[in-house]
A protein has these predicted regions:
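N-terminal low-complexity, acidic/polar interaction/targeting segments
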Residues: 1-190
Length: 190
């Protein structure tokens, strides 16, 4: 693990994103337009999982993302596609005068244990169906390594409409097997 040498901007959102996950964000508030400007010229930014019922200080981790695409929506609003390169532990948060938050972070390991591929084919094929039936999701991912068990389980966790507090239990380094069992039980009704 390495520490990030500078402060990174923090964007609090109810978005759960694991390494290699991609999502599209619509940016319209001036302070977050400034965040995007800073992030695009530096090291990216942190998406801080922020449910409506939580405060910034309750969550001590985030998704460190790079901006991989800029676009303008049909309504003229800036749209950015971001990809998570790593989870990070948030060591401290500072607030600037423009109400932007910045954090000192260090990278956090995620699912480094050996992965079991026994249930992969069923989860992979059902995920491939989701991509085929969702044009926007399908276009976000140029590569879909559905042969990679941790990638498949991570994408399912991001997509499933379950409570963020439950998803939060799967961010720890050794939580892969629990995550796989959870996704398998929901998707395949086991």
């Amino acid at each position: 693990m390495k520490a990030v040498n500078s402060r990174l901007p923090i964007f609090p959102l109810p978005v759960f994103l694991l390494p290699n996950g991609i999502t599209r964000l619509r940016i319209f508030e001036p302070r977050y337009l400034k965040l995007v400007k800073i992030a695009s010229t530096e090291q990216g930014f942190i998406i801080l999982l922020n449910a409506k019922s939580s405060s910034l200080t309750e969550i001590k981790w985030g998704s460190w993302v790079d901006i991989i695409n800029f676009d303008e929506g049909e309504d003229g609003v800036l749209e950015i596609d971001v990809q998570c390169k790593s989870l990070v532990e948030i060591l401290s948060i500072e607030n600037e005068k423009e109400q932007l938050n910045f954090g000192c972070v260090k990278e956090k390991s995620h699912w480094s244990q050996k992965v079991n591929h026994i249930k992969l084919s069923e989860l992979s094929s059902s995920l491939e169906d989701v991509f085929k039936n969702n044009i926007m999701l399908n276009t976000l991912y140029n590569e879909k390594p559905t042969h990679n068990a941790s990638w498949v389980v991570a994408r399912w966790l991001e997509l499933l409409p379950i409570n963020l507090a439950i998803k939060n239990t799967f961010i720890n380094d050794h939580s892969y097997q629990d995550a796989e069992n959870f996704v398998h039980a929901i998707i395949l009704n086991d």
